[in-house]
Amino acid sequence: MSSEVKSRWSGSGSQKSGTARKPTMLEMAENAASRHYEPVPLPLQRSNSPDSSTDKNPESRAADSRAEVIINPDIPPKAIALPLSRYRGRNPFFSKVNIQGRTYNFLERPTGWKCFIYHFTVFLIVLVCLIFSVMSTIEQYHYFANRALVWMEIVLVVFFGTEYIVRLWSAGCRSKYVGFWGRLRFARKPISIIDLIVVVASVIVLCVGSNGQVFATSAIRGIRFLQILRMLHVDRQGGTWRLLGSVVFIHRQELITTLYIGFLGLIFSSYFVYLAEKDAVDDSGSQQFGSYADALWWGVVTVTTIGYGDKVPQTWIGRTIASCFSVFAISFFALPAGILGSGFALKVQQKQRQKHFNRQIPAAASLIQTSWRCHAAENHESATWKMYVRQPTKFYVASPSPKTKKSVGKRKKLKTDKDNGLNSEKSLNVPNITYDHVVDKDDRKFENSNIDGYDSSVKKSLGILDVNSGALSRANSYADDLDFIEGEPVLAPITHVSQLRESHRVTVKVIRRMQYFVAKKKFQQARKPYDVRDVIEQYSQGHLNLMVRIKELQRRLDQSLGKPTMFLSVSEKSQDRGKNTIGARLNRVEEKFVHMDQKLNTITDMLHHLVAHQQGHPHPQTQPQAQGTVVQAVASTHSSLPSYEQLTVRRKDQDNQPDL
């Protein structure tokens, strides 16, 4: 190969010796021997003689048809670290929309330790500024606090102003805040209005201040108190106020009731104390309850358990009234605190339950997925097994052209399937199945390039490459290359569902069944209650539901079967006859059977009398008695029974005897 390359270089040099021009980069790239492409002859052109491939000169090999070329896996392909845009040649991580969205999430939706550090630092700065504002009102620290506060105010105004502009710009990542009107909608939010007021107030304070002092006049001191609104800057999303509002809304009825009754107690206690103490004079000679307003002030201070002690009842009547109403009113004024405390506790418990429930969602989804995969593994559809099939990675090179300049522009293109390719393997987390194949040592080079339709070759002309065939190997993956280097048998990947053997399918079924049991165990662990009180509540709720179901079942049984007759009185039995229950029907059937038994006994007695009358000759005096008994028995029977005349059979001798 080196001699051929040298001759080619010498030939090109002899043609251009007159100009003494150096070979261009294109010519060097064309004539250089490639270590990544090695030609493989077609099956029809293979010969058993070892010298058949060496006898051909470069011209004859150039005239041959195309040969398949296998990529040498000496240099494994490397994945790009940063994903590039599909339509641009740059990273979308640094695009405008991405930066805008990340900034908006960082400022408006803080999550993570970085956001926590930033917002906590802002809170500390605002708190320090508020402390210096308080110190500026003290005469001892007035000078020092004012000088430090001037520079702190300048820094904070610049910081909050810049942050407000950045917030306004980053809000454009959301559809409802796009454009001028969208930004105006964002600026009309309550927290944005507070930020704007804080920035404007700080600018006014700094501009109007004189001699380097922030608080020059009383008007500026009034504006300075607007800086307290900076403390609201910490809670951007208003989660604190939403939580408080939700608790108050849930317990609104209880709060309104307690406040209403407490207010009534305050009014009545203040009025009665005023009536008892309006003429009383203390030791200094002044009236402490000279008006109803003084009595109301005393009532508010008393029922709220503050007790300043500036107004005290002087008479025993007033003290008695005050003590009685205080016990009643204080109890109602203390109830809202307990109601709100219990509401916050229930809210925290509800959030914990929600977190516990959210942990069950992935476990339930995994259980459903694994159970469905176990069910799908039992059928023989090809879609069930496609996820275990690896599509071949194909490399293509453009067809050769007579022009040398165009041949340099040929590049290989990586083509992967989106569903079963290399990129989707990480998301599916499904291993690729390989199988063994036996080839001869002499034919390994050719068989490895055409295993069950596995096409990883690049078709290119031998005349252009013009290199000797060397050791060939598959360009499947880096792990396969290592296995091939170590001398282990090469496993070709499964590229079609038909190549899956029964052992593969059984293995997949076993793995899926194991995954199902693991997912089931995780779901059962996620379903376990996290507190003993929840266990008690769960058991009590289950017991209550069981009792309700038992009562419902008993009601339905009583409605369908009826109550047992042994527990019913005669009057209840008579009332139960008209009902269409199974018990009432059984009672009526029993009565019918008793009646039928009586009728059958009567019929049997009548038949016995008839048989005895036909066989014997009873005494004439007893015959009318017997006939009367039969007639009486017949009369006592139901009207539907046959009469005595129908049952009586006349004898033949009586028929033949003439009438006297």
UniProtKB/Swiss-Prot annotation:
PIP2 molecule is essential to activate KCNQ channels by inducing the coupling of the voltage-sensing domain (VSD) and the pore-forming domain (PD). Upon channel activation, PIP2 disrupts the VSD-calmodulin/CALM interactions, causing the release of CALM from the VSD which triggers the opening of the gate. Calcium potentiates KCNQ1 channel current through calcium-bound CALM. Calcium-bound CALM competes with PIP2 to stabilize the channel open state. GO terms for molecular function: calmodulin binding; delayed rectifier potassium channel activity; outward rectifier potassium channel activity; phosphatidylinositol-4,5-bisphosphate binding; voltage-gated potassium channel activity. It catalyses: K(+)(in) = K(+)(out). A 1,2-diacyl-sn-glycero-3-phospho-(1D-myo-inositol-4,5-bisphosphate) binds at Q237. Residues 1-18 have a biased composition (Polar residues). Residues 403-415 have a biased composition (Basic residues). InterPro entries: Ion_trans_dom, K_chnl_volt-dep_KCNQ, K_chnl_volt-dep_KCNQ_C, K_chnl_volt-dep_KCQN1, Volt_channel_dom_sf. Pore-forming subunit of the voltage-gated potassium (Kv) channel involved in the regulation of cardiomyocyte excitability and important in normal development and functions of myocardium, inner ear, stomach and colon. Associates with KCNE beta subunits that modulates current kinetics. Induces a voltage-dependent by rapidly activating and slowly deactivating potassium-selective outward current. Also promotes a delayed voltage activated potassium current showing outward rectification characteristic. Belongs to the potassium channel family. KQT (TC 1.A.1.15) subfamily. Kv7.1/KCNQ1 sub-subfamily. This is Potassium voltage-gated channel subfamily KQT member 1. It comes from Squalus acanthias. The lineage of its organism: Eukaryota, Metazoa, Chordata, Craniata, Vertebrata. The gene is KCNQ1.
